[in-house]
Structure formats: structure tokens, C-alpha cells
Amino acid sequence: MKILVPLLLLSSTAGAADTAAVTAIDILLQPDSTMLLRAEDNNARLLKVFPKGFALDATHRPHITVIQRYVRTADLDKVYAAANKVLAAANVNGIKLEAFKYYYIPSKDIGLAGIVARPIAELLKLQQDLIVAVTPFTVETGDSSAFVTTPDDPVIDPSLIQYVSTFVPKASGDNFNPHVTTGVAPREYLDRMLAKPFESFTFSPAGAAVYQLGQFGTAAKKLKEWDLKP
């Protein structure tokens, strides 16, 4: 009996930890080849001036964030099912988006840059429908354990933790800024880049997925993917 009690307590503690586990997710749209080429071109430019930045690769997938939320890890399958219903009812591949400018989010002397698309009505409706669908499975916040981290960079920037916590409503609806992140560079360089004329172009989503977020808000680990072809 003396042996069983600690074992039961250990089992109970592990179960509670599993229940409390949280994942920081990004429900996103994967852009077509037109956007991919432009994003990769810009990423190469940024890496030349800031080699310590990141390349667009398997752990930094080019994408358009629709929503970012903290969800209970135990409910991930329910999140996928809820998102699938919304995506199946929307003609996502038929959405035509216009990329019209560069932008960046400043962080001290550097900035996280991207290509911005206009937030058209179809995209805003998709976002709102996804927010409603996954709300039953969300929690208010998380910590570094909710994200993909590396041994060299184990602590997530507190500003990112806060950003995901307040994505709804601070980055949704009228505040939605659909974009494809392209990399990191010194703010001085990015200011010059933004001052130059931007050649607008149109593109469409080619797919949708759920990713676990990493540092800089990157799509670091694919959790679920959908084929949206009609």
C-alpha cells in the first residue's frame, strides 16, 4: 500500500499535466507559387544583409496566418475537425488576393518583415468563422512550452507570447493584417526597402494547415494539413 500511494499520486500528477498542456497554433493558408517565389526572393535579399536571420524552409514555412490561438493540447483533434468544417464550406482556392506592400514589425534595431495582402471580405469571413469554430478549445495564454523551441533558443520572446494571447481581437477583424513573413533585417535596411515602389501582384491560397508556432511567430511544426482542391 505504501508503494501504491506514491505511484497513484505520480499517475494523477502526470494526468493533470497532460490535461493542462497547451499548444500555440497558427491556422494558416499556404500560398501558391506566385507568392512563394516573391517571398523567397525577398528572403534571400534579407539574408544577404542579415545572415543571422532565417531562411524560408521546413521550419519557417511561407504562409498567411488566419488565426493564432492557444489551445488545449488534448483537444487538438477537435480543433482540426472544427477547422475542417469551416474550410470545407469555403471556396478557399477561389480567393484572389492582392499583395500590395512590404511591412515590418520593429524589435529594437531589427525588424520582422513581410509582404502584405489586402484583407478582402472573403478572407475576413473565413477568419471569423475559424475563430468561432475553435473558441471552445482555446485558453487565454501559454508559455514557452506551448511553442516549438530549440536548445539554442529555449525561451520564447514575451512579446510573442502576449501577441498570441491577444491575437483575437487585436490582430483580427478590422485589425487583420494578412501577410507572408519573409525574414529579419536591420530596421535601417527595411526602411529603405519600404520606401521603394512595390510592384503589386495577385495570388491565391493553395492549401491550408495548422502549425505549432516557433520563435518569431514562424510556422515551425506542421500538425495538420488539408487538400483544398475543388
Where are these regions (language model features)?
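Sec-dependent N-terminal signal peptides
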Residues: 3-12
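N-terminal targeting/docking segments
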Residues: 2, 15-18
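A generic membrane alpha-helix/interface feature
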Residues: 1-3, 86
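Conserved active-site/ligand-binding neighborhood in enzyme cores
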Residues: 110
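Basic, often amphipathic N-terminal segments
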Residues: 17-107, 120-209, 213-230
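A short, structured beta-strand-centered segment in the mid-to-C-terminal lobe
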Residues: 115-119
